[in-house]
Amino acid sequence: MILYLTYNDQPSGVYWSQVTDVVAHLNTLGGPRVRLLALVSARDYFTIRRKIRAHCPDAVVLPMVPQMKRWRVNAAIVALACRWFRPTGIIARGVLATWMALRARDKALVGKVCLDARGAYAGEWEEYRIVDDDALIAQFRAVEREAVLQTDMRLAVSQALVRHWQERYGYTGQQHVVVPCTLGRAHEEHVGPGGAMRSELGFAESDVVLVYSGSVAGWQSFGLLGGLLRGALAEQPKLKVLFLSPPDSGIDGLAAEFPGRVLRRFLQAEEVPQALQACDAALLVREDTLTNRVASPTKFAEYLANGLPVVISAHIGDFSQLVQVQRLGHVWNEGDALPVLGRPVPEERQRCRSFSLANFTKQAHTEAYRTLVAALT
C-alpha cells in the first residue's frame, strides 16, 4: 500500500481535482493500492471528513494537532498511521507533509517518500506571508531543502520548479517527474454550448466576455489585474468581465466604475464549466514573483478545456511559452495594454479544448504516474 498524505488542505475544487481524482487514477494503474490519509482541521472535522469521503470513500481523515506553530507534532499521527497500514511508500503533498513522512522513514515505518510539490513553498511564504508568523516563515527554507534533497522521488508541477530546486538547493538528481495541474472530472466532460448560461448572465451575442475564475487575493494579483481591466474596459466598448470569485472589495469597486459591464458570481465547482463556456476568453494575469514563475495554475487547463483562449502573463511557469508556441491565446507583458479581444470561432474553441484534453488529463500523464508508483514500491 501507498499512502497519499495531505496536511491542512481544505476541501475545494482544487482538492478534488489534484488530490482525490489523482488517488482514484493511481488506483487504476494496476499497482499497489493508494489510500488517502488527510490530516484536517479539528475545528470542523466532521464536516470536512464527510466532504472528503463523498469524493474518496475509503479516505482516512484524521484531526490534526491544533495551531500551525505546532505542525511538527503531527508527525506522531503519521507514524501511528504507518504502524497501522504498513505502507511501502508515502506521497506527501507539500513540504510540511513531506517532513512528517520523512520522520516516519527515519523510524523505518515506511520505506520511501515522494514529495508532491505544488510550488516553491519557501518563496510563497516569504513573498505572501501565508501565515503572519516570522518564526514559522523562517523554518521553511530548511524544511523545503530537506524535502527536495532527501526524498526518494519528487513530483513537480513544472520544469520551472525543477530549475528552481537546482538553483536554490543544488538538486542534481533525476528522480523526479513533472505533471502539471490536471483537469478535474467536471472539466473533462463536455457540458455543451454555454448559450443558456450566457443569456442567464445577461450577456448579448455582440458582447465579448472575458472571464477570471478563482480568488483575487495574494499571489492572484488583483492590484495588477484591476489596472489592466480598467484600461481595457475604457478602450473596448464591447468588452464585459465576469469574475467567478468570492466577494471582494476590489471587484465591487471595478463594477461601480463600469456599471453593467463587470459581474461577479460565486459558483459551486460543478457549475463552473458551463459558466466558462458562456465566455469568450480567459485571463490569467499575475505579478512577477518566484511563486508565479514556477506555478502551474489549475485554471489554465480548465480555461482551455472549456474552449477559451487565455490571456496570460509572460512568466507563469511553463505555460506562458506554451501559449505562444501553440497559439492558445495571448502572452501579456506588464505595461502593455490588453489586446483587443473578439469572440473565438468554433474551430478555435475546439482546438483549445482538444489541446487541454490531450495534455492535461490524468490519463495523459499515466507513464509519469507509473514511474512515481514504481519508485515507492
Question: Where are these predicted regions, by residue range?
Answer:
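Acceptor-binding helix/loop patch of EC 2.4 sugar-transfer enzymes
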Residues: 7, 111-145, 172, 179-186
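Nucleotide-activated donor-binding/catalytic signature segment of Leloir-type glycosyltransferases, i.e.
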Residues: 245, 249-281
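A charged, aromatic-enriched C-terminal amphipathic alpha-helix characteristic of glycosyltransferases
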Residues: 335-376
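N-terminal strand-loop element at the rim of the active site
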Residues: 6-13, 25-72, 161-162, 168, ...
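Membrane-proximal helix-turn-helix segments that form the acceptor-binding/catalytic region
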Residues: 24, 76-84, 99, 103, ...
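A short, active-site helix/loop in glycosyltransferases that binds the activated sugar's phosphate group
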Residues: 42, 137-175, 183-185, 249-253, ...
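A short, glycine/small-residue-rich beta-strand->loop->alpha-helix junction that serves as a flexible
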Residues: 5-22, 43-45, 92, 217-220, ...
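Nucleotide-sugar-dependent
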Residues: 13, 17, 220, 266-277, ...
